Amino acid sequence: PPCPPTVTPPGEHDDTFSYGRRVGYTDGSCIGTKCEHALRSAGYGLAWGKDHPNNVAAPLEGPWQSSQRAELSAAVRMTEAAPGEPLLIRTDSAWTMAGGLLLLQGYRPDVRWESGDLWRRWAAALRGRGPAHQVFLQKVKAHVDESHFARGIITRAEAEGNERAD
């Protein structure tokens, strides 16, 4: 389920923990989206915090290169990277968020899903965590300006975390 608004425990950084959960930001992108798949180049990022040693920027593996696969790969990798603690994944991808919420509700992806291999991998990673190490998802606004901060749509810490994953 989506997380409640962030309240940071005293002494903890807003971009590191929320309600006792490790916070991570994911993002993916692809250049050449109007080209055939063989000419596309996609990658993803994982951001755990400013200058965190486990931050990742990596190319998307495999022949199918797309922004959606890159976004989804980031969420899968983040879930796999922190198996022993509760996790809050913040993503700007509505597609990843919607599918992730279905997985968290116990829905099992089938072979007909676009990028079904990644959805099944994520579902397995989520099932293997157990109730003490739950994953929560939160949609964050991409491409923000001052008006988004003024209206409370996104916090500066969330925007900075999303930019680090970008």
Residues of each region from the PLM?
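Metal-dependent nuclease catalytic cores that hydrolyze phosphodiester bonds in DNA/RNA
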Residues: 5-6
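RNase H-like nuclease fold core
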Residues: 9-85, 100-101, 159, 163
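A structural signal for isolated positions on well-ordered beta-strands in alpha/beta enzyme cores
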Residues: 23, 88, 136-138
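Short, charge-rich binding segments
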Residues: 78-82, 88-89, 124-130
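Acidic/histidine-rich, metal-coordinating catalytic segments
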Residues: 87-100, 140-143
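Two-metal-ion acidic nuclease core segments, chiefly of the RNase H-like superfamily
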Residues: 101-146, 150-152, 158-166
